[in-house]
């Protein structure tokens, strides 16, 4: 079963090769990586091109013209992975906050459900101990209280960016109805999947702070994403399983 790991990048020159190597070291059959790069000025794309020459059929690069947002990057990556014939698509960050070691667990659980979420907020899940208490509290409140209450979601880690999707699930969601472009993209994808009746399971992960580079998730971005939850509710509150797109 062809599995493609979609990783969006912007200025991840120090991380992109190590994350690729870590994924390949898993030794999983029929697994490849698709990097979606937003024209990084630090040479991330050039590093991927070099890796492509040395590892044909194991890594691909989707160049985008500029930094247009996380949502658009993922939608472009998902569409390309589907075109490439992926039966399973894993999404994750490039900075090792999502450890590749969890990929086999995601894939194993996906045999029984439609979406698997690498979750910080189920039993056994954990956040990096280096997080300040205020940062932890904000993240917990946004996921466990604010977003779940507004959207009446069952998924505990609604902003999780580490997921495994079945091909049929992504096709049934219809990516064209997903409009969020920032970090609220993760919330909208999870909410629509729930409303359409897809089976979602969360597995615990340890979320490590990025090893190298600066986080792109600022306080203003978090506040904006929280406010956009109301837009997600307005757009999709009436969805039912009958609204699944025909694959």
Predicted regions and their residues:
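Acceptor/aglycone-binding surface of glycosyltransferases and processive sugar-polymer synthases
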Residues: 64-83, 100-183, 210-224, 243
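Short beta-strand-to-loop acidic/aromatic patch adjacent to the donor-nucleotide binding site
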Residues: 86-97
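Short beta-strand/loop segment that forms part of the nucleotide-sugar
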Residues: 30-40, 62-63, 92
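Cell-envelope/extracellular polymer assembly enzymes that use nucleotide-activated donors
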Residues: 2-4, 32, 188
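Acidic helix N-cap motif at the loop->helix transition within catalytic regions
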Residues: 14-18, 42-51
